[in-house]
Amino acid sequence: MQSSIQARWQVGLVAVLVVALSGCTRAAPEQRLRATLEAMHQAIEAREIGEAMTPVADDFVGEQGLDAAGLRRLMQLQMLGNRRIGVTLGPVDVQLRDDTARVRFTALLTGGSGRWLPEQAQTYQVTTGWRLQDGNWQLTHALWEPAGR
């Protein structure tokens, strides 16, 4: 009797694990993309331009034709002008399609000398495009505009 209960328990446990793991495998690309976005966010706040640029594709295109090199210069300029940079992301909407994704979010960017309050702040609506290449997500394009326009 006890072995029958143990067998049922084991079958039930295996079934739960299979369902849980199958849910994880479907969400894995989205989880990796969200982790990549979070790593970029952390790198920007830590003023690590190289780390922030790691997922940016060589063929990146941003606002008004900004390329990857221009994006790097834009980050450098912001870091030269602001001792402290803050990034606060709003809800992140991820839409996956095969090996590409579109990610939309609101970002509050702050900058200043590092004292109690930032000297400048701006909220942006951001739409980004991503490509999955060799298991890594690459940022291929980004559009941003000040919120409320």
Short names for language-model regions:
Residues 49, 94, 142-144:
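Hydrophobic/anchoring residues in structured secondary elements
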Residues 36, 86-88, 124:
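Residues that act as N-cap/strand-start positions at coil-to-secondary-structure junctions
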Residues 59-61, 109-110, 146-147:
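Solvent-exposed loop/turn segments at secondary-structure junctions
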Residues 77-120:
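Surface-exposed, charged secondary-structure patches
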Residues 1-22:
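Sec-dependent bacterial lipoprotein signal peptides
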Residues 26, 102, 120-149:
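Short beta-strand edge/turn micro-motifs at domain boundaries
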Residues 53-90, 96:
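Short solvent-exposed beta->alpha transition segments
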Residues 23-55, 72:
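Short, low-complexity N-terminal intrinsically disordered segments enriched in polar/charged residues
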